[in-house]
Amino acid sequence: MTVKTALRQGYDLLAEAGLAEPRLTAEVLLLHALHRERIYLYSHPEHELSTLEWLHYGRYLHERLKGRPTQHITRVQEFYGRPFRVSPATLIPRPETEHLVEQALQTAGGARTLLDIGTGTGALAITLALELRARAVATDLSFDALQVARHNAAALAAPVDFVQCDLASALTGPFDLVVSNPPYIPAAEMATLQPEVRDYEPHLALLGGEQGTEIYHRIVPQAERLLTPGGWLIFEIGYQGEAGVRGAFAHGPWQEVSLTCDLAGLPRVLRGRYTP
């Protein structure tokens, strides 16, 4: 079977199953089976797959059709132009989270020290450490997630130290910038998530309590303890979470609290400046 035929058959199977982005998914899975770069698919459409390549490709398609996320099959997801290893212990980095990176670079471009609370794959901490040329610390409650994050930091030569703890409870600071993409799915909405999210990604990284904003209210007081005066706390938030997260800033020494929406016009990033 040729590359061209394999792509067409993969697309047909994925499209008939109603899966999103069937063409792109077929390409990614075939590339994973071939251990090739994307340009190879179009420069060698008549390449004949070996028996082993076809078996791998067929298995990957079968796993995706059962609902397993593509990123769990390939074990990689790109974020801000860099490859990050993922695992079932980590949330898969989303393109929307790149808005947090952009806001951090614009708002706190001079930060020399930063903290990422609930790091998962390490995508935020690693990206900001490299883009800002800053020293980063990243925390997570999950030992397995931190193993993935450490691998990513080593692979990308990022200056990040990792600490296993609940939020930032084990840290003393100070930091110029604190970022977090904490769990923000309300408990009542967990059952409504897409199966590939609900059944495959860690609930520890998804479930944000009854309202979906409880963890923000725990992070803000810790940020007050850890930030340098004039430092920034920047969150990713859920599309219905703005009011609840703003409430976490309401009674502390915070100014310039502002919201940024994503490309779909949904509330995505909320930030505040620590001014004691």
Predicted feature locations:
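Conserved Class I SAM-dependent methyltransferase catalytic core
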Residues: E210-R273
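Non-catalytic accessory regions of SAM-dependent methyltransferases
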Residues: M1-Y42, E46-L49
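Conserved AdoMet
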Residues: L30-Q106
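Conserved RecA-like P-loop NTPase ATPase core
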Residues: L29, A153, N181, V197, ...
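A general structural signal for well-ordered alpha-helical segments in protein cores
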Residues: L7, A26-E27, W54-G58, T70, ...
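Conserved beta-strand segments of alpha/beta enzyme cores
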Residues: P83, R135, P159-D161, Q255-S258
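Mobile active-site "lid"/loop adjacent to the S-adenosyl-L-methionine
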Residues: Y184-I215
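Conserved SAM/SAH cofactor-binding pocket of Class I
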Residues: I92-T192, R218
